[in-house]
Amino acid sequence: MLTLGLESSCDETSCSLVQNGKILANKIASQDIHASYGGVIPELASRAHLQTFPELLTAATQSAGVSLEDIELISVANTPGLIGALSIGVNFAKGLASGLKRPLIGVNHVEAHLYAACMEAPATQFPALGLAISGAHTSLFLMPDATTFLLIGKTRDDAIGETFDKVARFLGLPYPGGQKLEELAREGDADAFAFSPARVSGYDFSFSGLKTAVLYALKGNNSSAKAPFPEVSETQKRNIAASFQKAVFMTIAQKLPDIVKAFSCESLIVGGGVANNSYFRRLLNQICSLPIYFPSSQLCSDNAAMIAGLGERLFCNRTHVSKEVIPCARYQWESACS
C-alpha cells in the first residue's frame, strides 16, 4: 500500500510517501519566521502551511518517483496541536482524498512520534513503556502493542522541550534553543550547579521548578521577570546549561525503573524532538537494562513519515479508524492506571 502522510501540527510542514512501512520520501519544511518572535506564532504557522503544502507534495512525489494517482491512502495528523495549523493539514488532506477518491485516516501526532521508532525496529518487544518528549508534550504510555497507547503519566506544567527553550532564552540563545543548549552543555561541568531533579508523587513530572532554579542561578535574589539578566561568563553559561540538562533528564530517568517494573514492560520506546538529545540517550542506556528503541534523527522531529507509517498500520489493522477526520487541539488518552 502506498500511503501519503501529511503533518502540520505546529511549525513544520511535511509530506511523506510510505509503502508497506518503507519510507520512499520524507520532505520537511521548517518555519524560520518564528525565530525573531522567540516562539511559534499560530497564525503565521497556519499561513506558512497553506503556502508550503502544494510545493512540498510535488517534491515528495517526484522524489519517490510516483504520481498522485498511485496513492492508495491519505494519512493526516489531526490531533493534538495548534488548531489552525491542524485545520490546514486536514483540509488539504480532505481535498486530496475527495479528488483522488481515496480513503482518509486521521492520526494522533504524539502516538506517531512513538510509532516512528517501531517503523525502524519491526521486532520491537511489547508490552513497552512509551516516552514521548517534545516541545509540547512529556508523556508516558503503556504500549501493549505498536498501535495502542494508554496514558501512565505526564507533565503537570511545562513540557520538557518548552523548558529547554525557556532556559535557552535565559542564556541568551536564539529560538528554538533546545539543540543549541545541548551543544553549549557539552563543554560545561554538569556538577557545577546543584539543580535538583523535581520529585512529584505518582508517575507525573514537573519542570517549572528547574526553570526557576536556573533563573535564580543567573539573577540571584533579584529574579523577577522584569529584572535584567546580568552579564554571565561563557564558562558559567556552559556550566549552567550542563547542570540544567543533567537535572531535567534525571527528572524523567529517576522514575523509569519503578514504572517499568509496575507495568511489566519489556522495552522502552522513546520519541519526539527531545529524543534526539545525545546526552539523554547515553543516560537511558546507563540506567535501563531493557532494550531501548529510538527513532533516527530525521524521524525525531515533526515529520510526515511517522504519520503515514502509523496511518497505514491502523488502516490495515482496521483499528481506531473514524469515518470523519476532525482537527482537535487536545486529546484525552485512556488511562493505564484505571
From Swiss-Prot:
GO biological processes: tRNA threonylcarbamoyladenosine modification
UniProt-listed Enzyme Commission number(s): 2.3.1.234
Assigned GO CC terms: cytoplasm
Pfam families: TsaD (PF00814)
Binding-site residues, Fe cation: 109, 113, 302
Catalytic activity: L-threonylcarbamoyladenylate + adenosine(37) in tRNA = N(6)-L-threonylcarbamoyladenosine(37) in tRNA + AMP + H(+)
Cross-referenced InterPro entries: ATPase_NBD, Gcp-like_dom, KAE1/TsaD, Peptidase_M22_CS, TsaD
Requisite cofactors: Fe(2+)
Coiled coil (residue ranges): none
HAMAP family: TsaD (MF_01445)
Protein name: tRNA N6-adenosine threonylcarbamoyltransferase
Subcellular location: Cytoplasm
Keyword set, alphabetical order: Acyltransferase, Cytoplasm, Iron, Metal-binding, Transferase, tRNA processing
GO MF term set: iron ion binding; N(6)-L-threonylcarbamoyladenine synthase activity
Superkingdom in the source lineage: Bacteria
